[in-house]
Every structure is written in structure tokens, then in C-alpha cells.
Amino acid sequence: MKVHEYQAKEILRRHNANVPFGKVIDAVGDFEKAYNEVVQKSPVVVVKAQIHAGGRGKGGGVKVAKTKDDAKAAAEKILGMQLITPQTGPEGKKVLKVYLEQGLEIAKEYYLSILLDRAIRKTIIMASTEGGMEIEEVAETHPEKIIKIQIDPGIGIQGSQVRELAFALGIPTEAQKSFTALVNSVYNAYIKEDAALLEINPLILTKQNEIIAGDCKMDLDENALYRHPDNEALRDITEEDPYEVKAKEYNLNYVKLDGNIGCMVNGAGLAMATMDIVKLAGAEPANFLDVGGGANPTTVENGFRLILSDPNVKGIFVNVFGGIVRCDRVAVGIIEATKKVNVSVPVVVRLKGTNAEEGKKILNESGMNIVGVEGLRDAADKIVSLIKK
């Protein structure tokens, strides 16, 4: 689960990390009070759009203001704008919140992130002297400037590793105590908050030899949110895909894609195989949808509603293997859903496993325009041919 910059920094504060003072507003009417608090910390105020995407500065979503009038003008311009960045896509994202933050006297910018490397099964700290740039650009143009340090999960980060990192980055001697404190705080936040990613870009060395988190991106592990009810409250559904928000309400695992064949499958592995076979047949899947092992008529109906809410869908491929789930119950769900949801696109169904024959019989005797197919490749070819008619 992604959180906004101002929320990520509040989490860092809880772990005693050095972050700039700031105030968030969601209306221009709140500007005066917020500005008056921030300007007490610094005469320069940075006005930042709050969206779940990077590259905000390139899109005009970050402005440095040296006067109150400039800050207010920036806030008025950014609030409500459709901000387009390299990470939002051409449609952009509407800015509903703006963060007013104290300006800093910057001497040098670095990059720092903590994430899980699944290949080696360890947390890694990744850092670079090229702060303020997208790390992907650095990896492509100057890979030698990226430093990686592996952290053993059993013992955590060690003082020697922090010193190694400071040396590799060329942190001045006068700032190393501040650097050590921040790295330890950020690592503790990453571990204790069950984060999947914690990225600080830029990590700022001020002219006063302080190390401060200038920006912060945090992605929290959704599977661990039950341990952090306070973090659950940080979710901003206006920043999430509306289809995926609806899927959460239905308790379905759904990811929207760009194709035109809706896929309803039980089991993540089979769902991915189904998408592959659709592509092999010459079409593109419209979604990943795993209805899970407890599929029932209600689940199937909700799955149909979700798939058909995408206007790009021209056909539906239902692929079910009956292990825990019974194919006859799925068949009943398909028929009920087809009637209730008013399905007007072709539907191809492949049932295998527990009570598959009973399920096929139910579909055949339903009188509905549902095509039953035996083979996986045959089913993919069939739905592709039907949407082309």
C-alpha cells in the first residue's frame, strides 16, 4: 500500500528520523495557517503536490517559494491540477492535497532506499551519490555509482555497515553522526512498519552538516496491515485504481490490464497461465482475476460485475479447476450472474476437476449463450474467434 510523502514522513518522525517540518492542506482556505507555521522554520517554503507517483517536479508539481505570495500562488495552481509525470501515464493524477514544507540549505544530495531483494532473501540498502535523479536513470547511465549493502535479517543493520555506506558516499566527517542516526532510524521504520520499500530521494546534506530526508516514498506490505491499524487508516482510495478498489470490496484478487478478453480463474498460477494462453491465441487479457478457492455463486457474480465494468471487455473466458471449489457451484454462479448482470458479450467456460461433469451439464441445460470447451488452448482460440465475429 502506497502512502503520500507527508504520511511517510510522519512515520519516519515516529522513529526519530530527521525530516523537514511541514503541513498538508487540501484547500486554499487552509493555506494561511499552514504557511505561518512553516515559515517560522524557514523563510523559503517548498510547495509539493501529494500524489502516489514520482517525478512530480518534472511535471510542475513542486515549487520553491521565497515569498508568501509566491507560495500561495503555487498552492492555488497545484491544488486541483491534473499532474502528469513519467509515472502517472498520459492521463495524469488529480492533486487533492498539497504539502507546505520548510526549505533547506542544500550542500549535497544523495539517494537512499531500503527494500527486500527476493533473489537473495535479504534486505538491501541501496545508495548513490546521484541524489535527486530517478534511480533507474542512474542504473542505466552510471551503474558504478550505485552502492548495495546486504542486511542479514537475523542480526539487522550493523554499525560497520553504516560506516561503510558513509565512506562509499563520501559523507563529510562532520555529518557522519547525523548520517548514522538517520540511517538507523530509517532502517527501524522499514522493519517495524513492515514496509516493502522505503526510498529517500533526495537524502540531503545541509550546509549545517545535517543529514535530512528531503523526500520519502514508502510502500507498506498490505499483508501485514493487520498489525498496523494506524497505517491502514493512511490508505487513500482516490489514488488507487477504481477497479481494484471495487475488487477489494468483493474480496477478489484483481489487476486491470489493457486487453479486451476478461479472465475469471481460480488460483493465481492458473490465472497467469490463462493470460499467457490468451496472448498465445493472438489476443490480450483485460485483467488478472483470481476468485480464490472458495468460489461460490456470489463470488462469480461479483467477478462478472467487475469484469464487465471495464468497457474494453469484448468477451469473457472462465477457466476453473475444481479442487477445493466445486465446478457445479461455479456453473450455477455463472448462470445466475449471466442473468443478473445482463451479460451481452460471448462467454467461454472451461471446467475441470471436482464435479466438472455436473457443472458442464448444468451449463448445457441452462439455455444460456455460454460456450463450454474442453481444452485450454481450444478455449482460448474459441473466445478469440467469438470476439472477432
Curated annotation (Swiss-Prot):
Mg(2+) binds at residues 201, 215. Binds 1 Mg(2+) ion per subunit. Keywords: ATP-binding, Ligase, Magnesium, Metal-binding, Nucleotide-binding, Tricarboxylic acid cycle. Its EC number is 6.2.1.5. InterPro entries: ATP-grasp_succ-CoA_synth-type (IPR013650), ATP_grasp_subdomain_1 (IPR013815), Succ-CoA_synthase_bsu_CS (IPR017866), SUCC_ACL_C (IPR005811), Succ_CoA_ligase-like_bsu (IPR005809), Succinyl-CoA_synth-like (IPR016102). Substrate binds at residues 266, 323-325. Disulfide bonds: none annotated. Pathway: Carbohydrate metabolism; tricarboxylic acid cycle; succinate from succinyl-CoA (ligase route): step 1/1. Coiled coil: none annotated. Its cofactor is Mg(2+). PROSITE patterns: SUCCINYL_COA_LIG_3. ATP binds at residues 48, 55-57, 101, 104, 109. It catalyses: succinate + ATP + CoA = succinyl-CoA + ADP + phosphate; GTP + succinate + CoA = succinyl-CoA + GDP + phosphate. It is an enzyme of class 6 (ligase). Residues 9-246 form the ATP-grasp domain. One of its GO terms (biological process) is tricarboxylic acid cycle. GO terms for cellular component: cytosol; succinate-CoA ligase complex. One of its GO terms (molecular function) is magnesium ion binding. Heterotetramer of two alpha and two beta subunits. Succinyl-CoA synthetase functions in the citric acid cycle (TCA), coupling the hydrolysis of succinyl-CoA to the synthesis of either ATP or GTP and thus represents the only step of substrate-level phosphorylation in the TCA. The beta subunit provides nucleotide specificity of the enzyme and binds the substrate succinate, while the binding sites for coenzyme A and phosphate are found in the alpha subunit. Belongs to the succinate/malate CoA ligase beta subunit family. This is Succinate--CoA ligase [ADP-forming] subunit beta.
